[in-house]
Amino acid sequence: TSNGFAVLMPDIVYKMDDPGMSALWAVLPAVDAAVKTGVVDANKMGLHGHSWGGYQTSFLITQTNRFKAAAAGAPLTNMISMYDLIYWNSGGGNMSIFEASQGRFLGGPWENWDAYERNSPIYHVKNVQTPLLMLHNDKDGAVDFTQGIEYYNALRRLKKPVILVQYLGENHGLGKLENRKDYAVRMLEFFNHHLKGMAAPVWMEKGVPRLKLGDHLNERAF
């Protein structure tokens, strides 16, 4: 453990046409097994993932309330809109990701609409009850920034507990050391609050105005 947290990394066994549901079917039994060891408090569990793991995190919280808090980095949230976007880091399209790679879909959305919709977090967003910390950067060249914005705006519209963190100019991950340190501390503060009952820092309670973001980051520099 580190900082009082035990970490579980479950293996996901995938079924075609159900990348999101497959995560649900794999993660929940793994969590049940972890709880049975006595190491894990079933009432104080968090969930975290980035990129494809961010997608799975965003999807899981639309299907279960088992987790008290979740953090998702650069998540795919709408399989249908993402399908036709560009993977800017390579310059190619996203279609192959969905039909021949991680998506594991049998065809495109126009011939397999129900599967794409069923496995897209955005279409189940009304079910979310879990507080979410979402990281998505404006220059993400793998998962388009609009994916994070779609999910964030829907959650906000429905008055769901969500915080969006963005590091200007960063890509799919965090390249700058100061940003990696900053986000690591924010994520720890987020989980400390929701899982350990520690006081929420000001940035979580009041947010940070876009025009004051630079000053805020300088004040928190590590």
Model-derived features with residue positions:
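Active-site-proximal cap/loop segments of hydrolase catalytic domains
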Residues: T1-F222
